[in-house]
């Protein structure tokens, strides 16, 4: 008799990542306990939090998410001028063009504060993500045991580097961009890892 291996797959989806928490809640309610979770972009962040068992943290993040928590001093400066949203976004677009992507330092700090790498490596839920190596473009699929020690948070951020809106994310000498450029819904990654039942959360 073939043993069942359950997986959850979180797609990329940017600001819609909060909807994945609703799906996570539903999976908890029906008792769907995954053996592994894979994710791309914002799905990599939510997937890591699932592997860590941080449902309440994930829910709190998305309930309180605002531009201030994603972008840097740029938002504080423009909001202090009491600008309408249309003007704010136009200025943000100009910053993206001028600087090669928006500065998302607050988001980076938030992700790094949440990533308990030791717990992630020893979680009963195996975690995997997709990112994209930049220039030349190449898909990169990694499970937690393949990620170098001390770089788990960096690879989650690399998976979510929504270039060109955000800057590419550099790890060592290599630049990465959003995993959605390679595989926005890493179902096959889960199947290749032995998943026989897959819950796909596509937003």
Question: Which stretches of residues belong to each language-model region?
Answer:
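Patatin-like phospholipase
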Residues: 1-40, 48-203
């Amino acid at each position: 008799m073939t043993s069942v291996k359950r997986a959850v797959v979180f797609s990329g989806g940017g600001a819609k990542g909060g909807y994945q928490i609703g799906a996570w809640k539903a999976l908890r309610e029906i008792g769907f306990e995954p053996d592994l979770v894979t994710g791309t972009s914002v799905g990599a962040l939510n997937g890591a939090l699932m592997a860590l068992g941080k449902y309440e943290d994930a829910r709190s993040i998305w309930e309180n998410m605002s531009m201030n928590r994603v972008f840097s001093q740029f938002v504080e400066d423009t909001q202090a001028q009491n600008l309408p949203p249309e003007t704010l976004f136009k200025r943000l677009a100009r910053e993206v063009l001028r600087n090669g992507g928006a500065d998302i330092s607050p988001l980076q700090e938030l992700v790094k504060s949440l990533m308990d790498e030791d717990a992630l490596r020893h979680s009963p839920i195996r975690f995997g993500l997709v990112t994209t190596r930049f220039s030349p473009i190449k898909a990169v699929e990694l499970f937690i045991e393949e990620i170098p020690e001390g770089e788990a948070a960096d690879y989650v951020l690399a998976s979510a580097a929504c270039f060109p809106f955000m800057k590419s994310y550099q790890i060592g000498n290599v630049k990465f961009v959003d995993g959605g450029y390679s595989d926005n819904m890493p179902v096959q990654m889960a199947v290749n890892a032995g998943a026989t039942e897959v819950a796909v959360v596509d937003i």
